């Protein structure tokens, strides 16, 4: 136990290199510096002010690691526990240049309470734990690979890539990456949420409203890249109004979309539907690029829905719109019977076969 009041604490050499030391408890509002590796039962910085500078590359404990004040990384850093929590209560930043961070808590948790990357972004961050939770913001051009479950209570903005192997609970309004977002496990959404990326967004499993929430609105925007839905959407608890914007949208054979009374809008230049899309509100499918042509029921067009895909659009929508008022590309329709109220909006609409409508139609 070390208490220096307002003074600094400095570990110049390796701690526990021959045999791990016991619990390290530190209290000091000055700068605590680890210049080399640490092997101990636990490491706890009790102070909420001051800075802990981890410059030695590695801290390994059998018990918890808790950093109550701001943490800076002066080297590529590995923090390891034996199935115990790693907690950052204060901010976490790189020092000098972007530093990589590897966290291994086993069956313990990784908890970020303070902002990450607000001064100088981290590099590649890998977190292995039962659950990784951010309660504040993640910013900067870092990559985050989370092995285990994730809870996002704080916003994520400007990071490069984000990957979660387990389940994801989204309780924040913004997740923005300049690169990819990949969610292998089930995703549950608690609040109105906007997911945006400069590259592909991929959902490997289900997406639902969280059990404690009521129909949050959801926006998914992968720019000119691909949004892929490989699991059922809304099968357990439907989302609120949902918009998907991408260069290409793909729903796999298990990627059904159940909207009930919530509206669904898909804006894309290419689409592949492999499972049922159902709802009682409105469905809009519009081109992302104004000049994109639309082909329906075997007709040619870049944004194309063949007969099988049209059959996946279940009867029951209050209105279905294909195209947009801003679009200039031609809509070409093969032989098909549309049963819901349908609006086709584009520069030109033509039929290569027998269009039949059992609901209202406007062209």
Name every feature range the model reports, one short phrase each.
Residues 1-363:
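Extracellular lectin-like interaction modules
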């Amino acid at each position: 136990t070390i208490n220096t009041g307002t003074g600094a604490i400095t570990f110049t050499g390796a701690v526990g290199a021959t045999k791990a030391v016991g619990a390290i408890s530190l209290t000091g509002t000055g700068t605590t510096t680890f210049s080399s590796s640490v092997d101990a039962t636990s490491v706890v910085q009790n102070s909420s002010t001051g800075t802990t500078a981890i410059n030695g590359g590695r801290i390994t404990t059998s018990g918890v690691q808790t950093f109550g004040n701001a943490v800076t990384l002066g080297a590529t850093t590995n923090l390891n526990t034996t199935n115990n929590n790693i907690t950052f209560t204060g901010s976490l930043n790189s020092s000098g240049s972007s530093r990589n961070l590897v966290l291994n808590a086993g069956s313990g948790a990784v908890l970020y309470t303070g902002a990450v990357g607000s001064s100088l972004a981290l590099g590649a961050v890998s977190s292995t734990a039962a659950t990784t939770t951010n309660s504040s913001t993640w910013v900067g051009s870092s990559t985050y690979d989370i092995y285990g479950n994730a809870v996002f209570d704080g916003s994520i903005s400007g990071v490069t890539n984000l990957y979660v192997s387990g389940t994801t609970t989204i309780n924040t309004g913004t997740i923005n990456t300049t690169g990819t977002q990949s969610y292998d496990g089930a995703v549950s959404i608690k609040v109105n949420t906007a997911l945006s990326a400069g590259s592909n967004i991929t959902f490997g499993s289900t997406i639902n409203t969280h059990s404690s929430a009521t129909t949050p609105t959801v926006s998914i925007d992968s720019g000119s890249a691909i949004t892929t839905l490989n699991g059922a959407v809304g099968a357990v608890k439907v989302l609120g109004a949902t918009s998907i914007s991408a260069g290409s949208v793909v729903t796999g054979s298990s990627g059904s979309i159940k909207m009930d009374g919530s509206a669904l809008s898909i804006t894309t230049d290419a689409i592949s539907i492999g499972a049922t899309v159902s709802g009682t509100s409105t469905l809009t499918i519009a081109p992302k690029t104004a000049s994109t042509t639309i082909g329906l029921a075997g007709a040619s067009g870049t944004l194309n829905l063949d007969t099988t895909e049209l059959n996946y659009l279940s009867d029951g929508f209050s209105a279905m719109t294909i195209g947009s008022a801003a679009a200039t590309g031609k809509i070409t329709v093969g032989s098909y019977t549309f049963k819901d109220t349908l609006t086709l909006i584009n520069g030109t609409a033509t039929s290569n076969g027998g269009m039949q409508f059992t609901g209202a139609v406007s062209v």
